[in-house]
Amino acid sequence: MTLVIDASAVAAWLLPDAVGIDLAALASRHDIFTAPWLLWAEFRNILIVTERRGRLPLGMADQLIEAVDALGIVLDQTPSNAAVLALSRKHRLTVYDALYLELALRGGHDLATLDAKLADAAREEGLSVAR
């Protein structure tokens, strides 16, 4: 079973002061993690901002990137432009969040997110949301 995972879920699992989704538990129920290509940049941005704010020791970002890479998250490169825009309009989501929703819908996958608006949109579309 495949799980679409967003940057908020990954960050909450790995950052030392964050509380969130237990990806280890989700991994026992899902054999593949996937995300839009955007996750690559979003997660690194979260790390660098967290580091700048002093919440992450210098150098730890590199270790966390290695941990995420070890998850083997499959990055999707083929979103439907029309579907992403339609979902963004329908649910008043950013295009960034609509990318995650479109991928989950296209594959019929569950979605892991801590973003309340994205989770609500996924539920409205009939998807299961891990929080």
Q: What do these predicted ranges mean?
A:
Residues 13, 33-37, 77, 94, ...:
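Active-site-adjacent beta-strand anchor residues
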Residues 43:
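Entry/capping segment at the start of metal-dependent catalytic domains
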